[in-house]
């Protein structure tokens, strides 16, 4: 198992050499510090505790400051454990090149908050008849039998939706920019912009695609039309996509859910 911590920057799109448009999410992956190494003998399970992004020391408690000093690093903002990951020692640095283009990963983050909503949107209830005489349209409906004389704890009711831990599995890594410390992941990932996420090796173990298969995959073979001018793929589309997305989000306000 391998994994890394990052921050969601935003979404963009790139074009493959065969003209396919690929929607991608840019994840900024700064250098991760191995804070602690947990073993089965001492802790009961095997894991690495990773930390990323500096934090003011005045915002860190004394016990936490001691943990960072043991790893010879400054206080960090985002700390997470990744289980069944080994091969590193306390104080080691993990970079974006731990993954390769074509690999499949599982991304875990906190979903966007959507505020207070009704039972139809929150729990996918069916609404009542919308005619004027029905007297029931978008209500909760029956809340239980008469006998308990109360509403049971498990009853699905209106309330807050979002800001929950969500994992999306088997997302493909389209490209890696080691200079800008960025990963381009196919599709969307949970959370708003500037949200911290955990990227781990896909647990279901899909066979990774090689970069040549990824960029030169074609749906079907067609005979070229001599009347249509062939457009060559633009070089550096990955760098351009990363630069544009990073620039667009640099001055954006921080998310409330962070």
From Swiss-Prot:
InterPro entries: Ribosomal_uL3, Ribosomal_uL3_bac/org-type, Ribosomal_uL3_CS, Transl_B-barrel_sf. Gene3D superfamilies: 3.30.160.810, Translation factors (2.40.30.10). One of its GO terms (biological process) is translation. PROSITE patterns: RIBOSOMAL_L3. GO terms for cellular component: cytosolic large ribosomal subunit. SUPFAM superfamilies: Translation proteins. GO terms for molecular function: rRNA binding; structural constituent of ribosome. Keywords: Ribonucleoprotein, Ribosomal protein, RNA-binding, rRNA-binding. The keyword RNA-binding applies. It comes from the Bacteria. Belongs to the universal ribosomal protein uL3 family. One of the primary rRNA binding proteins, it binds directly near the 3'-end of the 23S rRNA, where it nucleates assembly of the 50S subunit. Part of the 50S ribosomal subunit. Forms a cluster with proteins L14 and L19. This is Large ribosomal subunit protein uL3. It comes from Spiroplasma kunkelii.
């Amino acid at each position: 198992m391998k994994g890394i911590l990052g921050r969601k920057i935003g979404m963009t799109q790139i074009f493959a050499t065969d003209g396919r448009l690929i929607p991608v999410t840019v994840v900024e992956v700064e250098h991760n510090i191995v804070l602690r190494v947990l073993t089965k003998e001492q802790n009961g399970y095997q894991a690495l505790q990773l930390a990323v992004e500096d934090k003011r020391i005045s915002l860190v408690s004394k016990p936490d400051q001691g943990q960072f000093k043991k790893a010879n690093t400054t206080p960090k903002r985002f700390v997470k454990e990744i289980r069944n990951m080994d091969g590193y020692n306390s104080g080691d640095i993990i970079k974006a090149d731990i993954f390769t283009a074509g690999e499949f990963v599982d991304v875990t983050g906190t979903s966007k908050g959507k505020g207070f909503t009704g039972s139809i949107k929150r729990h996918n209830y069916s609404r009542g008849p919308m005619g004027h005489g029905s007297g029931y349209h978008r209500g909760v409906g029956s809340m239980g039998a008469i006998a308990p004389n109360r509403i049971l704890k498990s009853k699905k009711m209106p309330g807050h939706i979002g800001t929950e831990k969500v994992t999306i599995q088997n997302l493909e890594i389209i490209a890696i920019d080691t200079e800008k410390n960025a990963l381009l992941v196919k599709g969307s990932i949970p959370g708003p912009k500037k949200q911290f996420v955990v990227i781990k090796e896909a647990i279901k173990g899909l066979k990774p695609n090689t970069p040549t298969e990824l960029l030169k995959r074609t749906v079907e073979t067609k005979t070229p039309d001599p009347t249509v001018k062939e457009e060559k793929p633009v070089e550096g589309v990955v760098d351009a996509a990363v630069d544009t997305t990073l620039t667009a989000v640099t001055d954006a306000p921080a998310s409330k859910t962070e």
